[in-house]
Amino acid sequence: MAKVSTTVESSIAVPRAAFYTWLVPGVFSNQLETVLRDAASLPGVKSTAGTTGPWDVPGSTRIVNLTDGTNCRETVQQATTPDYFAYRLTEFSSPPVAGLVKEAGGQWWFTDEAGGTHAKWTYTAESKTDFGIVLLTPIIRILWHQYMTEALERIKARAEAEVKGGSR
């Protein structure tokens, strides 16, 4: 079926290797709820459970519990330190999401730039039906884009404050 994507990007004043290590096996592994909060009428992450392995190892899975009481399964697809991280979301318990979305996923690219790291995050959702993409497109391109923007702003602020070599 059809897919819809959105991308956010940011310059982060932290060296790439240090930022990747702080984010992927760090924040993404055990502090996801600190950066993926309620935003743009969408639920945030409440907790994660049942993690099967380190969060920078492909094949590791977990259940992501959301603040609205729903959840989904997340699987690490690829992790290439310090350049790239990809994950896949399936088994959505929310009836509206489960009715619309076959699967979704995110890709993160990290590149060196003057003064730190350029982070690029693309999120893609695959619709279960041709009609579903009509409903899914504005949700992803407007609401989810805003959600991602706010999350990346929190990630940037925290990384620059917490990681050695950051600008603050």
Predicted regions span which residues?
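Beta-strand/loop substructures that line and gate deep hydrophobic ligand-binding cavities in soluble
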Residues: L89, S93-T149, G166-S167
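A generic structural signal for beta-strand entry/edge sites
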Residues: K3, P82-Y84, A114-H118
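Hydrophobic/aromatic beta-strand elements that line small-molecule binding cavities or substrate pockets
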Residues: V8-S10, C72-Q78, E103-D112
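Glycine-rich portal/gate segments that line the openings of hydrophobic small-molecule binding cavities
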Residues: N30, S41-G99, E150, R154-R158, ...
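Short, glycine/acidic-rich beta->alpha junctions
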Residues: V4, D68, K102
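Hydrophobic ligand-binding cavity/cleft-lining segments
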Residues: M1-P54
